[in-house]
């Protein structure tokens, strides 16, 4: 089992006298900047232009500056701009101002693992990957808790990169829950795999296909939505809170029997084989190459995919079901 690092295993000492530049002020950027500042660290916010994020940062009490100015004044640079933008920000706004002994920090390993960013050997490169969205990272921290995180070291020029990674994790609140050490390779490949075959791709497609099967068989769309999509939250919540065994204990005997038999029929060895093929594409770098090419063309697959989902019957029915659910929600 992996070692879990908690508060007592980490100290802010390795970074307490450092100036930290947070590049980006979106979901994760805002949470990181606020949590690091509230932990007593000196934080600068670096942005590409004076847009909405600039105004939000100002309203939060920061004095945002252009990215290159933040880099020039900092010891630690944290990349919290979108994955597909990072290499351009690094090349144009960060690399020209890097000094020996600086730190480059990432929340996801994509750009380092696939060599879209190749830092000089004279800087530390490490990662802290919170296992939750930015608003939750901030909310849990503000309430005295924390979201778990993964940490990894790619380059250890100073000999203290891991200690600094733990320090930032502590400042984010992650060590209040638990931090697990990984590698850039492992985090990147497992994260992409989970998104594609499970969280964003697999489960979404499974629910939509199940809905379509019922509707095509003549069942009312509203009933089909309840049975194949809406109730997913209840099952996932049970798994999150009690594990698979706890979830199974909470459902009926009929549901368990049907699940054990039909589940393995639908998600069979052929599906597992295809999952392995998806993993092979991720590990070989083919997915990254394809995604970069797609992005450079304006991401037509994303544009068309979003249009198809937005106009689908299940999305239309879902809006109606959510309205019904909201009407029945108790007033707080």
Swiss-Prot record:
Positions annotated to bind Mg(2+) 1: 191, 195
Entry annotated with the keyword Membrane: no
Ranges of residues in domain KARI C-terminal knotted: 183-328
Binding site for Mg(2+) 2: 191, 227, 231
A GO term for molecular function: ketol-acid reductoisomerase activity
Class in the EC hierarchy, top level: oxidoreductase
Keywords: Amino-acid biosynthesis, Branched-chain amino acid biosynthesis, Magnesium, Metal-binding, NADP, Oxidoreductase
EC numbers for this chain: 1.1.1.86
Family statement drawn from the similarity comment of this UniProt entry: Belongs to the ketol-acid reductoisomerase family.
Chain sites annotated for binding substrate: 252
InterPro entries per record: 6-PGluconate_DH-like_C_sf, KARI, KARI_C, KARI_N, KARI_prok, NAD(P)-bd_dom_sf
Residues covered by the KARI N-terminal Rossmann domain: 2-182
SUPFAM superfamilies reported for this sequence: 6-phosphogluconate dehydrogenase C-terminal domain-like, NAD(P)-binding Rossmann-fold domains
Name of the protein this chain belongs to: Ketol-acid reductoisomerase (NADP(+))
Record Pfam families: KARI_C (PF01450), KARI_N (PF07991)
GO biological process: isoleucine biosynthetic process; L-valine biosynthetic process
Cofactor(s) needed: Mg(2+)
Catalytic residues of the enzyme: 108
Function per UniProt: Involved in the biosynthesis of branched-chain amino acids (BCAA). Catalyzes an alkyl-migration followed by a ketol-acid reduction of (S)-2-acetolactate (S2AL) to yield (R)-2,3-dihydroxy-isovalerate. In the isomerase reaction, S2AL is rearranged via a Mg-dependent methyl migration to produce 3-hydroxy-3-methyl-2-ketobutyrate (HMKB). In the reductase reaction, this 2-ketoacid undergoes a metal-dependent reduction by NADPH to yield (R)-2,3-dihydroxy-isovalerate.
């Amino acid at each position: 089992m992996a070692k879990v690092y908690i508060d007592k295993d980490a100290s802010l000492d390795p970074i307490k006298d450092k100036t930290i530049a947070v590049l980006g002020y979106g979901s994760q950027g805002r949470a990181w900047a606020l949590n690091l500042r509230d932990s007593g660290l000196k934080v600068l916010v670096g942005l590409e232009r004076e847009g909405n994020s600039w105004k939000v940062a100002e309203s939060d009490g920061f004095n945002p500056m252009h990215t290159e100015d933040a880099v020039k004044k900092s010891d630690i640079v944290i990349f919290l701009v979108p994955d597909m933008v990072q290499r351009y920000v690094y090349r144009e706004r960060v690399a020209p101002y890097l000094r020996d002994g600086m730190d480059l920090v990432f929340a996801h390993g994509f750009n380092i693992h696939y060599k879209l960013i190749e830092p000089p050997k004279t800087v530390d490169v490490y990662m802290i990957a919170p296992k939750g969205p930015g608003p939750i990272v901030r909310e849990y921290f503000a309430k005295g808790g924390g979201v778990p995180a993964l940490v990894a070291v790619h380059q250890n020029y100073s000999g203290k990169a891991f200690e600094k990674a733990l320090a930032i994790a502590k400042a984010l609140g992650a060590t209040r829950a638990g931090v697990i050490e990984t590698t850039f390779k492992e985090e990147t490949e497992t994260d992409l795999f989970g998104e594609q075959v499970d969280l964003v791709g697999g489960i979404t497609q499974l629910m939509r296909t199940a809905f379509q099967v019922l509707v095509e068989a003549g069942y009312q769309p509203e009933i089909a939505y309840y049975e194949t999509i809406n109730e997913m939250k209840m099952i996932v919540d049970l798994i999150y809170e009690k594990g698979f065994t706890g979830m199974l204990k909470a459902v009926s005997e009929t549901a368990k029997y049907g699940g054990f038999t039909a589940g393995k029929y639908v998600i069979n060895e052929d599906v597992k084989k295809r999952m392995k093929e998806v993993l092979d594409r991720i590990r070989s770098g083919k997915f990254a190459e394809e995604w970069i090419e797609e992005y450079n063309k304006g991401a037509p697959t994303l544009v068309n995919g979003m249009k198809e989902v937005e106009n689908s019957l299940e999305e239309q029915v879902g809006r109606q079901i959510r309205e019904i659910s909201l009407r029945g929600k108790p007033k707080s």
